[in-house]
Protein backbone atom coordinates (compact mmCIF):
# COMPACT_ATOMS: atom_id res chain seq x y z
CA UNK A 1 0.00 0.00 0.00
CA UNK A 2 1.13 3.56 -0.69
CA UNK A 3 2.51 5.73 2.09
CA UNK A 4 -0.03 7.93 3.82
CA UNK A 5 0.23 11.14 5.80
CA UNK A 6 -2.13 12.72 8.31
CA UNK A 7 -2.91 16.39 7.80
CA UNK A 8 -4.66 18.47 10.48
CA UNK A 9 -5.95 22.02 9.97
CA UNK A 10 -4.67 24.20 12.83
CA UNK A 11 -5.75 27.70 11.72
CA UNK A 12 -8.88 29.21 10.21
CA UNK A 13 -9.26 29.78 6.48
CA UNK A 14 -11.25 33.00 7.00
CA UNK A 15 -9.57 35.97 5.30
CA UNK A 16 -6.99 33.83 3.49
CA UNK A 17 -6.14 33.95 -0.19
CA UNK A 18 -8.75 32.18 -2.33
CA UNK A 19 -6.10 29.81 -3.73
CA UNK A 20 -5.11 28.76 -0.21
CA UNK A 21 -8.74 28.14 0.75
CA UNK A 22 -9.06 26.03 -2.42
CA UNK A 23 -6.01 24.00 -1.39
CA UNK A 24 -7.57 23.27 1.99
CA UNK A 25 -10.78 22.13 0.29
CA UNK A 26 -8.73 20.01 -2.13
CA UNK A 27 -7.07 18.32 0.83
CA UNK A 28 -10.51 17.63 2.31
CA UNK A 29 -10.10 19.93 5.31
CA UNK A 30 -13.21 21.80 6.43
CA UNK A 31 -12.62 23.19 9.93
CA UNK A 32 -9.99 23.68 12.63
CA UNK A 33 -8.75 20.40 14.15
CA UNK A 34 -10.19 18.40 11.23
CA UNK A 35 -7.79 15.56 10.32
CA UNK A 36 -7.62 13.63 7.06
CA UNK A 37 -5.36 10.78 5.96
CA UNK A 38 -4.06 11.19 2.41
CA UNK A 39 -1.73 9.34 0.06
CA UNK A 40 1.78 10.79 -0.02
CA UNK A 41 1.91 12.02 -3.63
CA UNK A 42 3.54 15.00 -5.30
CA UNK A 43 0.15 16.69 -5.82
CA UNK A 44 -0.78 16.41 -2.15
CA UNK A 45 2.66 17.61 -1.06
CA UNK A 46 2.32 20.65 -3.32
CA UNK A 47 -1.01 21.61 -1.76
CA UNK A 48 0.42 21.10 1.74
CA UNK A 49 3.41 23.31 0.90
CA UNK A 50 1.07 26.15 -0.14
CA UNK A 51 -0.84 26.09 3.16
CA UNK A 52 1.95 24.88 5.47
CA UNK A 53 1.25 27.72 7.92
CA UNK A 54 -2.33 26.49 8.48
CA UNK A 55 -1.77 22.73 8.82
CA UNK A 56 0.15 20.19 10.88
CA UNK A 57 1.59 17.09 9.18
CA UNK A 58 2.23 13.66 10.69
CA UNK A 59 4.02 11.05 8.61
Curated annotation (Swiss-Prot):
Organism (species): Photobacterium profundum (strain SS9)
Protein family (similarity comment): Belongs to the universal ribosomal protein uL30 family.
Listed name of the protein: Large ribosomal subunit protein uL30
Coiled coil: none
Pfam families for the chain: Ribosomal_L30
One cellular-component annotation, GO: cytosolic large ribosomal subunit
A GO biological process held by the record: translation
Stored Gene3D superfamilies: Ribosomal protein L30, ferredoxin-like fold domain
Record-linked PANTHER family: LARGE RIBOSOMAL SUBUNIT PROTEIN UL30M, MITOCHONDRIAL RIBOSOMAL PROTEIN L30
Assembly information from the UniProt record: Part of the 50S ribosomal subunit.
GO MF terms held by the record: structural constituent of ribosome
Record's keyword terms, sorted: Ribonucleoprotein, Ribosomal protein
CDD domains documented for this protein: Ribosomal_L30
Amino acid sequence: MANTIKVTQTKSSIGRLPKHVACLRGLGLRRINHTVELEDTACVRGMINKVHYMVKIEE
